[in-house]
Regions:
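Histidine-centered divalent metal-coordination motifs
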Residues: 49-51, 93
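Short beta-strand His + acidic residue motifs that chelate non-heme Fe in jelly-roll/DSBH
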Residues: 67-70, 85, 92-100, 168
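Single conserved hydrophobic/aromatic residue that forms the stacking wall/gate
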Residues: 161-165, 169-170
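A short, N-terminal "cap"/entry segment at the start of jelly-roll beta-barrel domains
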Residues: 1-42, 46-47, 75-77, 96-105, ...
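Short acidic-glycine-tyrosine-enriched beta hairpin
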Residues: 71-86
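Short beta-strand segments in beta-sandwich/barrel cores
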Residues: 39, 63-67, 82-83, 116, ...
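Short N-terminal edge-element motif at the start of the domain
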Residues: 55-59, 65-68, 73
Length: 170
């Protein structure tokens, strides 16, 4: 089972223990600490809040995700983009739905870092496929520079490029 909370402006599903959801059997999986599926109402979001020693990946599925932080980054990302924030020694950031009339749906993933107390870092990446091939996996995050994005952990993230319609009913 997953945790679920409805705060009016935020509907969120938690794969692991998070906020008011606690399941001692679901605190983390290896280095994966958080896998949240969030839906944020238009114009709403998370005010400035701190993180330390965590790799935070945000993946918009629908809508416009506005990010701002204490190391002078400010931008809006959309589906096909990802943002990677290495909190290191500490960073303060906010995330908001930049639309006035459309829901924002995004995944937020937290990964424990390989090395703690590094310099905070933020970057966004366009991970839209550069191929027209269907049903392929695309490497979007890797620790060794072999993907558009990297994090401070031995972790690889793959994205399904495109699922074609089945040619026959199942």
């Amino acid at each position: 089972s997953r945790g679920y909370a409805n705060h009016g402006w935020l509907k969120t599903h938690h794969t692991f223990s998070f906020a008011n959801y606690y399941n001692p059997e679901r605190v983390h999986f290896g280095m994966l600490r958080v896998l949240n599926d969030d839906s944020v109402a238009p114009g709403e979001g998370f005010d400035m809040h701190p993180h330390k020693n965590m790799e935070v990946i945000s993946i918009p599925l629908k809508g416009y995700l506005r990010h701002g932080d204490s190391i002078k980054n400010s931008e809006v990302i959309t589906p096909g983009d990802i943002q990677v924030m290495s909190a290191g020694t500490g960073i303060v950031h906010s995330e908001f739905n930049d639309s006035g009339n459309e829901q924002l749906e995004f995944l937020q993933i937290w990964v424990f870092p390989r090395e703690e107390n590094t310099k905070p870092h933020y970057a966004s990446y366009d991970v839209r496929p550069v191929t027209s091939e269907k049903n392929k996996l695309s490497l979007i995050i890797a620790p060794d520079g072999s993907a558009p994005a990297s994090i401070n952990q031995d972790a690889w993230f793959l994205s399904l490029i495109h699922i074609s319609e089945p040619t026959r009913p199942y």
